[in-house]
Amino acid sequence: MPVLSNPSFYLPLVDITPFLENPHGAAAQDVIESVRTACKSTGFFQIKGHQVPLRLQKSVFEASARFFALPLKNKLELDSRKTVGFRGYDVMETQSYELEFGAVQEADALRDIKEGFFIATDLPPDHPHVANGRFLQGPNVWPKPEQLAPEDFQSVLEEYYTEMQRLSHVVLSLLAATLPYGPHVFDELETCDPMSLLRLLHYPRGLEKQDGKKLQLGAGEHTDFGTFTLLLQDEHPGLEVQDSVTGEWHGVPPQEDVYIVNVADILSTMTEGDYKSSVHRVWNIKSNDRYSVVFFYDGNLDYKVKPLRSSGQDENEEIDAPTIEEHVRSRLTASYAI
C-alpha cells in the first residue's frame, strides 16, 4: 500500500502498462493498489502507458482549436440546445453548476466561462433509442464542409471517440480489479450501447472575474455526473481539485501523454461513497486560451444507480434507484436550466 504524506489527498501518476500486459502479475497488483488508494482518497488519479497515440492526442487539440476559431454564427448553427441528443456546440456561458441544487435563482447564477462541442455514439433517427426519445441519444452534427473540412475535424473526433471507448473498457477493468466483486462486476454497465459523451472545451483567456464574493470561473465547483471521466489537458494549467478534509484547492499540472481519471457520482454511489467523487473546478489563471478534451463515461441507460454490495438483495432498493438515464438527465438539465 502506498505510504501517504497527506492521506486525504493522494493523486498519483500510475503507469498502467503492467496491468495491460498481465493483470494478474505482481507488478499489476501495485498498479491496482495505487488506483484503489487514490479512489478512496481523492477519486482522482493520472495514467500513462494507456496506448492512446500521441499523434491522435495532438490532432484532437488541433481540431478543437480549428472549430472554436470559426465565426460565432457558424458555431451557432450547431447549438446543442436545438439538436437531437444534445450534440454540437455548447454556447459560452450557458452552463452553471450553481443551478443544480437550486442554490441560486437562474438570474443570479454565475455561468461557466467556457464553450464546448459534444459528440457521442452516432445513432440514426430510426434507432430505437432515438425514436423513443431516450436522453442524449441521436445523430452527431458537424460543421459544413466548406466551413471546416471533415478530415480536419469530424474524422479526427470520430477516431478519438473510438479510442476513448477502448480506454474506458480498460479503466473499467482496472476499477473492477480494485473492488471485491470480481472481474465481471461492470458487465451490465457496459451493455446496450453504453452512454458516453466526448466534449471539447475552450476556456478563453482573460475573462474570469470576481463577482462580489464569488469567482466566475471557466468551470465552477462541481462533481461529475457519470461513472468516471477521462480528461486530457493541454499545456496550460487550470484544473483544481478540493481536499475534502481540509478544503484546500490543489492544482493538477498538465503532463504530456497523461490522462486524468476521476471517479464520478455514479461510481461513488456504487461504492457507497468509499470511492470519492471530489469537487473540482477550472480556473484559467494564465493569459492563454486553454483547451481540454473530456470523455464522460456513464454506461447502460437502464442500469440502476445503487450500491454494488446490495445488488439483487433488496427489492425496494432496486425499485427506488434511478436509472443512469434518469440520474444524468436530472443533473445535466438542471445545470443548463433546460
From Swiss-Prot:
<comment type="similarity">
    <text>Belongs to the iron/ascorbate-dependent oxidoreductase family.</text>
</comment>
<dbReference type="InterPro" id="IPR050231">
    <property type="entry name" value="Iron_ascorbate_oxido_reductase"/>
</dbReference>
<dbReference type="InterPro" id="IPR005123">
    <property type="entry name" value="Oxoglu/Fe-dep_dioxygenase_dom"/>
</dbReference>
<dbReference type="InterPro" id="IPR026992">
    <property type="entry name" value="DIOX_N"/>
</dbReference>
<comment type="function">
    <text>2-oxoglutarate-dependent dioxygenase; part of the cla gene cluster that produces clavatol and ortho-quinone methide. The clavatol biosynthesis cluster cla and the terrestric acid cluster tra are both involved in the production of peniphenones and penilactones. The non-reducing PKS claF is responsible for the formation of clavatol from successive condensations of 3 malonyl-CoA units, presumably with a simple acetyl-CoA starter unit, and 2 methylation steps.</text>
</comment>
<dbReference type="InterPro" id="IPR027443">
    <property type="entry name" value="IPNS-like_sf"/>
</dbReference>
<dbReference type="GO" id="GO:0046872">
    <property type="term" value="F:metal ion binding"/>
</dbReference>
<feature type="domain" description="Fe2OG dioxygenase">
    <location>
        <begin position="193"/>
        <end position="299"/>
    </location>
</feature>
<feature type="binding site">
    <location>
        <position position="224"/>
    </location>
    <ligand>
        <name>Fe cation</name>
    </ligand>
</feature>
<feature type="binding site">
    <location>
        <position position="290"/>
    </location>
    <ligand>
        <name>2-oxoglutarate</name>
    </ligand>
</feature>
<keyword id="KW-0479">Metal-binding</keyword>
<comment type="pathway">
    <text>Secondary metabolite biosynthesis.</text>
</comment>
<keyword id="KW-0560">Oxidoreductase</keyword>
<keyword id="KW-0223">Dioxygenase</keyword>
<feature type="binding site">
    <location>
        <position position="280"/>
    </location>
    <ligand>
        <name>Fe cation</name>
    </ligand>
</feature>
<dbReference type="Pfam" id="PF14226">
    <property type="entry name" value="DIOX_N"/>
</dbReference>
<dbReference type="InterPro" id="IPR044861">
    <property type="entry name" value="IPNS-like_FE2OG_OXY"/>
</dbReference>
<dbReference type="GO" id="GO:0051213">
    <property type="term" value="F:dioxygenase activity"/>
</dbReference>
<dbReference type="Pfam" id="PF03171">
    <property type="entry name" value="2OG-FeII_Oxy"/>
</dbReference>
<feature type="binding site">
    <location>
        <position position="222"/>
    </location>
    <ligand>
        <name>Fe cation</name>
    </ligand>
</feature>
<protein>
    <recommendedName>
        <fullName>Clavatol oxidase claD</fullName>
        <ecNumber>1.14.-.-</ecNumber>
    </recommendedName>
</protein>
<dbReference type="GO" id="GO:0044283">
    <property type="term" value="P:small molecule biosynthetic process"/>
</dbReference>
<keyword id="KW-0408">Iron</keyword>
